[in-house]
Each structure stands twice: as C-alpha cells, then as structure tokens.
C-alpha cells in the first residue's frame, strides 16, 4: 500500500491506498476550519501547531498496517511552509524507520488525481483547477507534461468567494456559504464580467470583488434578501468569468477528456456550466467526489501510486519543501 500524507495548509490527512487495485483501505482527515474561523482565515503558526499534534496521532492509528506499506507519498509543494514541514518531517521519519521509499507529490498534481481515485488515469487531459490558492487552466499531454494555458493575476476563484463572504459578514471559509445563499435568489445585480473584451487568456477577480464592496456600501444595511442577491450576482458573474475564458480555450483544444479539481470545484453551479460545455464538445467531464474536492491525503496517495509505478522516488536528504508553485518544474 501507498501511504499518503497531506499537510499543505490547514487540513491534516493520511490515507492508505492499494497500489494494484486502487482500493482506499484507510482514510482520515482532521480539518482545522473551526479553529481558524474566528480569525477570518488560516493562521500559519496555528496550523503548524495543530499539524504537529494531529499527524502523530493519526499515524499511531495505522501502525497495524506498517508492514504492508510499500512507499510513502507526501505533499512537499506548494503550500504554507510551516504546514508543509509537518507532513514532510513525518514522512522522512517514517521512511527511515520503516525503510520505505519516499515519493514527493505536488499538491496541485494531487488534486488532478482526485478524479482518478478509483480508476486508471487518462491523459491527454484538460484541467480547470479552482481552489483557495490557485485558478489555472492546464493542458496535460500524453506523457504527463503540464502546460499552463491560463491563470489568475490576482485573487483566485476560491479566495474571492472567501473575501466576498467576509464582506457580507459570513464565516470562514465562505465558498459553501455564498453558494447556499445564491440558491435562494437569481441575482439581478449587473456586475461586470472581468476582462470580457480582453483577448488575454487570464483571470482577475479583484475588480469583481471591488464591485461587490461598492454594492454593499450602497446598500447600507445588509438584510437577508440583500445578502442573497449580492451572493447570487457575485457567484453568477465569477462563474461567467471562468467560463468566458475557458470556452475560448476549449474551442482551441477540443479536449476529449476534461477535469475540474480543487476545493472550489465542489460548487454545483460551476459543475453545471462545465457539464454543459463538455457536452457541447462531446467531451467526458471528470469530477472528484465532493468528499475529495478539498485537500485530502487520498489524492496524494493516488498520485503516489502513479509515481510508485514509475519508480519516481526521492532520497530523504533531498526532499525539501517548496512553498510556491514552480511553473518550470510543474509536471505529473
């Protein structure tokens, strides 16, 4: 079995996956959302302390499986440096004590494998990655080379939801709260879709966020109906922005297989728009189970299986954390 360890942000998670059947034999995740909610966002030092407490307790529970572990896969990039250290340190210690090979996994690559948890991976593949930290449109070739076709120049899709939620007086994280409010209203505010007439294939959510701020200031008192209208109008415009650029890229690439991954990929309105786009081109849309859209170790273990079969191991002395995404070395 492949042991997956994930600690790139505020979720501590481990998983055991059979490298032959892809059966998920063990999965555990401890979310820190409640701990960070009162601060309105993730506090790195607090996240690190909680990882230090949670990971050893989680590993203790899988001791009966130690003899069955073939390799240890761990997220080492990108993420909060103080959080990454927790998982990487644990993986190194286990690698030495159990004499098992180490596998370094890019967190975003892990998200890509979240749509292949129980089935063989399919490449070439188009990918929309939407999360709290990234908004990317990717093209993955048959040999696993990743090309970045579009990315955000400021806030990410998921981050913009969190910030708008905060403006509306909602708790952190705000993505699901915005989505739930939006279900009660069609959204009749005419927010401008960012970069609509700009030929550049890139995303920007800061201007839309500013439009929301001005609407809130104009409204004055924020009643339930005003909250719902702003949330629905914002979500509709943010998704329209995603689809505007993605549709242009889809027309050029005409992918047979397309995936949407990342924490924000759980948004049902976004999924519906993507299903319509895939149907238009006769593509197969790959979606992760809602449980595995957000950060988790099952996807890290699954990416680990892929790398294990290719014998992509790394010596513990050479395994370092990389807080920021290295586009030059971004590959499956």
Curated annotation (Swiss-Prot):
UniProt-listed Enzyme Commission number(s): 2.3.1.234
Biological-process GO terms, alphabetical: tRNA threonylcarbamoyladenosine modification
Keywords of this entry: Acyltransferase, Cytoplasm, Iron, Metal-binding, Transferase, tRNA processing
Needed co-factor(s): Fe(2+)
Known catalytic reactions: L-threonylcarbamoyladenylate + adenosine(37) in tRNA = N(6)-L-threonylcarbamoyladenosine(37) in tRNA + AMP + H(+)
Residues noted as binding Fe cation in the record, renumbered to the chain: 107, 111, 295
Pfam family, one: TsaD
Subcellular location: Cytoplasm
MF (Gene Ontology): iron ion binding; N(6)-L-threonylcarbamoyladenine synthase activity
Major location category of this protein: cytoplasm
UniProt-listed InterPro entries: ATPase_NBD, Gcp-like_dom, KAE1/TsaD, Peptidase_M22_CS, TsaD
Similarity annotation: Belongs to the KAE1 / TsaD family.
Functional summary from the UniProt entry: Required for the formation of a threonylcarbamoyl group on adenosine at position 37 (t(6)A37) in tRNAs that read codons beginning with adenine. Is involved in the transfer of the threonylcarbamoyl moiety of threonylcarbamoyl-AMP (TC-AMP) to the N6 group of A37, together with TsaE and TsaB. TsaD likely plays a direct catalytic role in this reaction.
Name of the featured protein: tRNA N6-adenosine threonylcarbamoyltransferase
Organism (species): Campylobacter hominis (strain ATCC BAA-381 / DSM 21671 / CCUG 45161 / LMG 19568 / NCTC 13146 / CH001A)
Gene: tsaD
């Amino acid at each position: 079995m492949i042991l997956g360890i994930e600690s790139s942000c505020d979720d501590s998670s481990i998983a055991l996956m059979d490298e032959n059947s892809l059966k998920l034999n063990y999965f555990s995740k401890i979310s820190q959302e409640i701990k960070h909610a009162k601060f309105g966002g993730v506090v790195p030092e607090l996240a690190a302390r909680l990882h230090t407490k949670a990971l050893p307790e989680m590993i203790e529970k899988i001791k009966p499986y130690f003899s069955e572990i073939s390799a240890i896969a761990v997220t080492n990039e990108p993420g909060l440096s103080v959080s990454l250290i927790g998982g990487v340190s644990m993986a190194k210690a286990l690698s030495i004590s159990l004499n098992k090979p180490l596998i370094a996994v890019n967190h975003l690559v892990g998200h890509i494998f979240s749509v292949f948890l129980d089935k063989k991976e399919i490449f070439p593949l188009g990918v929309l990655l939407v999360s709290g930290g990234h908004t990317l449109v990717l093209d993955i070739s048959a040999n696993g080379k990743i090309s970045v076709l579009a990315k955000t120049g400021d806030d990410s899709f998921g981050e913009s939801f969190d910030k708008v939620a905060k403006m509306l007086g909602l708790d952190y994280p705000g993505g699901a709260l915005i989505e739930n409010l939006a279900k009660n209203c069609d959204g009749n505010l005419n927010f401008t879709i960012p970069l609509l007439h700009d030929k550049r294939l890139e995303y920007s959510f800061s201007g839309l966020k500013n439009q929301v701020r001005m609407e809130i200031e104009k409204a004055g008192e924020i009643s339930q109906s005003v909250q719902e209208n702003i949330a629905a109008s914002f979500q509709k415009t943010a998704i329209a922005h995603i689809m505007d650029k993605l549709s242009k890229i889809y027309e050029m690439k005409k992918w047979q297989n397309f995936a949407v991954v990342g924490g924000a990929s759980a948004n049902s309105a976004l999924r519906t728009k993507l299903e319509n786009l895939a149907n238009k081109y006769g593509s197969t849309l790959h979606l992760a189970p809602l449980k595995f859209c957000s950060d988790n170790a099952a996807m890290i273990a699954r990416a680990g299986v892929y790398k294990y079969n290719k014998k992509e191991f790394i010596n513990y002395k050479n395994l370092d954390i990389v807080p920021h995404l290295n586009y030059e070395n971004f590959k499956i």
